[in-house]
Amino acid sequence: MLKQAILNIVALVSALTCAAEAKVEAQSTQSQATIIIAADEPTKTYDPMIFGGFIEHLGKQIYGGFFEPGSPLADAKGFRLDVIKAVKELKVPVIRWPGGCFVDSYHWQKGVGKKRQPYDDDRWGVLEPNTFGTHEFIELCRRLGAEPYICQNSLASIQEMADWVAYCNATTGPFAEMREKNGHPEPFNVRFWSVGNEKVGRGYIDKVRDTAEAMKKVDESILVTCSGSHGPRADIDPYLFKTAGKYLDLLSVHEYWIPNLQEHHAPDYLSCMMLSEKPDTHISAVVKSIDEAGMRGQIKIAFDEWNLRSWHHPGFSGHQPRKVDYQDPEIIALIKAREKSLEPSLYTMADALFCASFYNACLRNADDVTMANIACIVNQTGPLYVHPKGIVKRTHFHTMAMYANMLKEHVAKAQVKSERLTYGSSSVAMVDAIATVDESGKKWAIAMMNRHPSKEVSCTLKMGELLVDGIYEATVLTADSPDAYNDIESPNRVMPKKIALTFKEGITSLPPHSLVIVDVLIE
């Protein structure tokens, strides 16, 4: 039993006080919480695809991110070896590409073969050289150990979309021959395909039906998704399920809780924490729509673009083409403004804890959410900042690494009794938790977070009715402020370190703005 338990505690923590002007209400001087793990009840298996990533041909995600031919840090093929090494730490199981709204002007045949066809993406104001195409994407995925997930241009013809599936997966025929001529005789075996990105309307839904049918005729083993919801509205048009439901395996859901596309926002830590329960409510609303359509269990959720913050891309809607003169001072200024998303000071402990909150929501809904892709994985708002001379691991990089590497295979019920953290008219639970266990039922990993910016929380951890007790090793992600961040000058300001942590009669102290993952081995 628990008398023989061995606990290794790994914690993502940051340490001191919030800004003096922050107004936080709590019920008592010593905040308290209790976490009760249902250790003897049935568990459910989650899909590690929830730790996926997304890359788009915008904002130095690919060019100047993963792919930088001529860089001293790149190999002969142009892949940044330092970036690949870092992302492999995250065990990213799936990468979605090439968009995003960028895909609305993307035609895959221009990005294969020796003679690539550059073009001007006038929806986003991007000059696309097409040197990174299907073959390069597949090679990147193979190097990362990730499955490729291709998002189709739904404005293209149905035939063009079906042909891309054939180019990637066919073993015989003209597109298999074309792929072999371009250097890859073996099929790529791409499983995941999306019909379009962030589209709505019955015309789109009809095209989803016809395209999904055509793609599955090429390869019946593929898994097909389409646009379900994007933005704060999570309800789904019932016509989608009625018309295309039988062809769908996944439903694409997108949300960025701080919209930055046209106007740039940098809310404080507490404002960000007030958003940290939104993923739970968003997922619940999507599940409700699927359930009402009678397709819960058949169609799963792919939350294939998510982040606390969206990137800044002013002056371009991504939907309407416009004439772009790249010598125009106004266009130059708009393109320059995109770099605001790269500002290191944006990515604080708020991002680290929101990231954990999002994963907790996915894990709680493991029966319904089978994929999630942080947007994006490098540069812009991603966990890894890439610059010409190296990389910086942002705060949420460490959250992702901890979750991807430490959690066990199954999710158990965890009841959390916690005070509320209040800011203005909003509030969230001060403490959140998730519990996972391995196949044997003996090895547990329990994640606990304290969202309070400046107060420790006295937290009781119980496995059923039994209390965890003793002094245990811990890995702690420490910072000197909830607003701490990593940058080129101080890349290790927020990073893990080992400490000793005490549980006395089940009680430990959760530091301010912290996430703690506790490993429990029951012999």
Show the residue positions of the predicted features.
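Alpha-helix capping and helix-coil boundary motifs
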Residues: 11-15, 133, 265-267
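Bacterial Sec-dependent N-terminal signal peptides
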Residues: 1-28
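Active-site His/acidic residue clusters
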Residues: 255-271, 316-318
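Non-catalytic accessory regions flanking glycosidase/transglycosidase catalytic cores in CAZymes
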Residues: 22-237, 241-250, 276-314, 323-523
